[in-house]
């Protein structure tokens, strides 16, 4: 990417590992002053390299003990209505990831739920209010064990 050098790449890698690292500590790692690091981070934010900062939060804090992966086969994967229909889903606190992808299933939604009943309620609402006339079929998987999980942005 234009305007990015090796020092910027190190800064981004370090922030991915620990977004709470101090500017002084980060400066030590890249051989710059805290002020110079701050300027580089602001540049990376303006360029869109750094889109935000997140915390890895245990979903059980919110009473959500069940993680589900919902795959959706769309009737028309290129439907112009898709972005508008997905907008409210993207804003739901318990939905952490929504992807449009290649393959048999076109959408993947990952979310956390209190229990199977709340997952079922979400699925009924999803089909009735959002995916009516758009989805051919869905496939739901329950996560049994988590080995690695990225942070979830808190808004």
From Swiss-Prot:
UniProt KW Ligase keyword: no
Stored SMART domains: HTH_ASNC
Parts forming coiled coils: none
InterPro entries associated with the record: AsnC-type_HTH_dom (IPR000485), Dimeric_a/b-barrel (IPR011008), Tscrpt_reg_AsnC-like (IPR019888), Tscrpt_reg_AsnC/Lrp_C (IPR019887), Tscrpt_reg_HTH_AsnC-type_CS (IPR019885), WH-like_DNA-bd_sf (IPR036388), WH_DNA-bd_sf (IPR036390)
Annotated ranges, domain HTH asnC-type: 4-65
Keywords on record: DNA-binding, Transcription, Transcription regulation
Gene Ontology CC terms: cytosol
PROSITE patterns reported in the protein's UniProt record: HTH_ASNC_1 (PS00519), HTH_ASNC_2 (PS50956)
Listed name of the protein: Uncharacterized HTH-type transcriptional regulator PH0045
